[in-house]
Each structure stands twice: as structure tokens, then as C-alpha cells.
Amino acid sequence: MKENAASRVLFILLLFLFASLLNGQSPPEKPKLIKCRSPGKETFTCWWEPGADGGLPTNYTLTYRKEGETLIHECPDYKTGGPNSCYFSKKYTSIWKMYVITVSAINQMGISSSDPLYVDVTYIVEPEPPVNLTLELKHPEDRKPYLWIKWSPPTLTDVKSGWFSIQYEIRLKPEKATDWETHFAPKLTQLKIFNLYPGQKYLVQIRCKPDHGYWSEWSPESFIQIPNDFPVKDTSMWIFVGVLSAVICLIMVWAVALKGYSMVTCILPPVPGPKIKGFDIHLLEKGKSEELLRALESQDFLPTSDCEDLLMEFIEVDDSEDQHLMPHPSKEHMEQGVKPMHLDPDTDSGRGSCDSPSLLSEKCDEPQAYPSKFHIPEGPEKLEDPETNHTCLQAPQSTSGEGKIPYFLANGPKSSTWPFPQPPSLYSPRYSYHNIADVCELALGMAGTTATLLDQTDQHAFKPSKTIETGGEGKAAKQSESEGYSSEPDQDMAWPLLQDKTPLFSAKPLEYVEIHKVSQDGVLALFPKQNEKVDAPETSKEYSKVSRVTDSNILVLIPDLQAQNLTLLEESAKKAPPALP
């Protein structure tokens, strides 16, 4: 019995369910959110489209939450925006916040929810259409008539505060036309329309759009009637230009017809014929080139010639090897000053390349013929720094026959600057000066050469004036014994004839600090500070007066002359070596 009762109840329930299905009752369909719109970024409204209710009463609920929050809120106002809408007032509106909105449909059979809609109020702004649209025809005196359109921004849009800016779009057309003429007016509230058709009735509409958002709806249509006498275009200027152009063209055609040849000649002048003197056109036409060239040659035309034919090529041969290895002796007496008589004849003839220092060193290694007699004092003497005065020691000394002057005073700077081979046994001590002339005078022996040099260069320079002394007089310097140069037996070098017993260097260093005379060729005539004897070393001589500077920037030093110094200089002049023949 119990089993029969349970089966009966289940059967009854199935009958009721089948009956309900036959009556069309079911859960509601899923609703759809259409859009959300904000008129001015302060409030916004959302609309949805409901689905089938399933034959039962259905309730719709809009819920939302802000991005980053978990709390779900229900729509605050279902009535302000109309049916199936939700209105958010300023209290519930936030800028730069994302809203997640969902609509749910509920009845007795079940519940259905829409897909979520993500809304940012900044980008859903859709303002109301502009208001107060005004149309008016203007007839200014100085310009053409036009249609003046004026409007006002939407009431719910705060444009004056600068919250956002609005762009406008105006469209108009004749009443019976199908296409609209569109004009764009950014941030303006008025517009002028020209070139309207007279006698037509125009329809005008306007809409607006914010910087970020959507275009508003078109405003209601406005009408205006254009009168029949309304000028469309000002063609008077074009008519005047056309008439003037036609007149100018007619005048030009008439002038060409009357004076065609003269005008063509003026515009395109003829090419002038050839006017070369002696040029015969007939000879050129006949092809007789020889006669034509003969005619040209007879008209004072200079014959052409190759410039290279006029040049003479020559080679200057210079085989004088000893001329550069040995200095040239002076040939004039140096009465008015020490002047070099020898001038190098080398004037860019290729001798410079042959007289290179490396080549001269090779030439000096070869055996050469030197003057007949040469005396070298005994006893070699090593120097402290042989590089300081190698210039004079490497060059053989020579005295002129008349002036008794070393060769470095008679030759130019070129003959005495290149190195000569130096025997390893020849050395000279370092002195307190490094002048070339001073060192060379020491090489010849200061005892005999200095006086001769002073007597031969300028005897008028012995008048001392305002002697300047840099060192104290009478100071004795201890010096070692003089040592001469030792000559090697296999070298037969040409040196001037010196005294047999005269040492090559003084026993004590000579400090030349006073100049007697400088010649025009840069030769120094030096005076010692005090006269000294070669055989008996005495106090050092200090030179402190400059006599003159030669053309070659060589100083002539004069000592503080005293009576005993003059006597010693005269004695040394008498002992000077005789001149070589």
C-alpha cells in the first residue's frame, strides 16, 4: 500500500510539471546591458535590454562594484533614467574609477545574469545636443550676404569652468535634397555659410562631442527660407577679367598680322655670320684645308711652339770632394773685421744631397793629402764631456796667409757645422762656456791666437768703456798640468803650423765674458778677463764686457783691460804662428 501511495504522488507531480510547461512558464532569459552614458562627467546612466520572462513575473536588479573593491552595491535610482535603466548621481559617480556592472533577471522559475560591463566615466561622456539653434540671413554692405548660424552649449555640460571642451558639427541641406552638407566648428558657437541657392528652404541640425567620448544626438531640425534675390556668387570680377583678356589677345593678333616679319625679327634675331679676318667661306665649302690654313697663317698669327722645346736640360757635375772636407783659407787681410772670404757656390745644384753628414763621414775615412807640416803637443788630455765641443775638434784648423785667423772665422756657417772624423785620442776639457769660437780658439792655443785675432780684426776696439765684471778679480784657480793631443801615426791630417813648444790648451779654464768685436759674418773677437801666461798658470781671467755682436749673432768679448794685460797681449801677438803659404 505504501509503495502505491508514493508512486501516486510522483505521478501527480509530473502532471503538474507537464502542465506548467504546457502553459509556457520557465526561468527568465539573460538580460543585456546596452550602454552607459554621462552627460558631463558628473553623473551617468546605464540602460539594459531584458530578455524573455518565462511567462512569470520577473524582477531586474543592477549591481556594481568598483575595481579593486569586493563590496557589491545595488543601483541607487531605477526611475530617473526611465525604464530598464539605472541613474548614478554625483554622490555615486567617481572619475578615474572603473565600474563593473551586472544586471540580473529573477522569477519563480530561476535567475539569469548578464555579462559584466566595464565602465569608466571619463570615456562614456555623451553630452546633450546643443540648444538655442538660431538661423539668420545677413546682408552686409561691403561683403556678400551669408547665412549666420548660432547655438549654445548643452545645459548639463560645464564648458565655462574648463572641465572639458566641446566640438561641434553642423549639417544643412535644401528641403527636397537627400545629401547633407557638413561643416565642422571646433570650440565655436557660430558659423557663416555662403553660396546658398536662392528660393530654397534649408534644414539645419547640430550636434556636439567632448574630447573623450561620443557624439551627441542631432538637435531638432531648424528651417530657413532663402529669398529669390539672394546673390549666389559675385561674378562681376570674373566678367571684367575675361573681357580684358579677350581685348589683349585681339590686339596681339592684330599686331602680328600687320608687322609679322619685324616682330619675329625682334623676338628671334638672326644669327650673325662669321667675321674672322682672312676667313674664306668658299675655301671651307670646297674642302681645301691647306689653303684655308695658309690664309690664317698670313694674318699675323704667331706660330705655335712647344714650351718644352725651348728648355735646356743640363747637369751640373761637382767632383770637388776636398772642397767641403777642408775649409777654404782666407785670401784677404782682416783689417776692418773678421769676414769670411769663402762663399759656398752651392745654389741648389744637387750638392746638398752629396754633402750629407753620413757621406762626409765616409769621405773623411779615406786617406787625404794635407799641408806639409803639423805639430801636436804631447800628452793627451781627456775631457769631461766630449760632446759639448765636438764641432771644432772634428774640423781641421787653418790660418790664412795674411790675417792669421782660424778657418772657422773665414768660412760660412755651412762649412763648419757638419761633423768631421775625430781621432779617438783627441779630447778637450770642458770649460765654463760653450761658444764655438771660444772652443776653437782654445784648440789653436789661446796664448798665441787671441792676441793675433784681436790685432787683425780691429785695433780700434781696444778702447775699453764701462767694463762690467761678473766675477771677482785676482782669484786663483788651481789647474792641472796641460796635456796636448797625441797624433796617430797613420793619420796625416792637415793642421796649421803651430809653435813646437806651445801647448794646445791653457792650463786653466778661460771664462770669456767680454766681447771685443763681432764681424759682419758672425765672428767673435774675445778679450780675456786678464792676461795670462801659458807657461806659468796664474789667476783665471774673467770677461765681463760685450764689445759687439756680428751678423751671425757671435759675441766679441773684451776683458777689463789694464796695462799689464795689454803688454801680455802684445807679447802673445808676436808669438803667433806664421801663416801657411
Swiss-Prot record:
Pfam families: EpoR_lig-bind (PF09067)
Glycosylation sites: N59, N132
Motif Box 1 motif, residue range(s) on this chain: 267-275
GO biological process: positive regulation of cell population proliferation
Cytoplasmic side: 259-581
InterPro entries from the UniProt entry: FN3_dom, FN3_sf, Growth/epo_recpt_lig-bind, Ig-like_fold, Long_hematopoietin_rcpt_CS, Type-I_Cytokine_Rcpt
Signal peptide: 1-24
The keyword DNA damage belongs to this UniProt entry's keyword annotation: no
Keywords associated with the record: Disulfide bond, Glycoprotein, Membrane, Metal-binding, Receptor, Repeat, Signal, Transmembrane, Transmembrane helix, Zinc
Record: residues binding Zn(2+): D211, H212
Biased composition range(s): Basic and acidic residues: 323-349, 375-388
GO-annotated molecular function: cytokine binding; metal ion binding; peptide hormone binding; prolactin receptor activity
Residue numbers on the Extracellular membrane side: 25-237
Membrane topology classification: Single-pass type I membrane protein
Disulfide bonds: C36-C46, C75-C86
Entry-linked CDD domains: FN3 (cd00063)
Chief localisation class: membrane
Tissue-level expression: Expressed in all tissues examined; liver, pituitary, adrenal gland, ovary and fetal liver.
Residue stretches spanning the membrane: 238-258
Motif annotated as WSXWS motif, chain positions: 215-219
UniProt region (Disordered), positions on chain: 323-388, 462-492
One Gene Ontology cellular component annotation held by this UniProt entry: receptor complex
Family listed: Belongs to the type I cytokine receptor family. Type 1 subfamily.
Protein's job: This is a receptor for the anterior pituitary hormone prolactin.
Subunit annotation: Interacts with SMARCA1. Interacts with NEK3 and VAV2 and this interaction is prolactin-dependent.
Protein name according to UniProt: Prolactin receptor
Organism of origin: Ovis aries (Sheep)
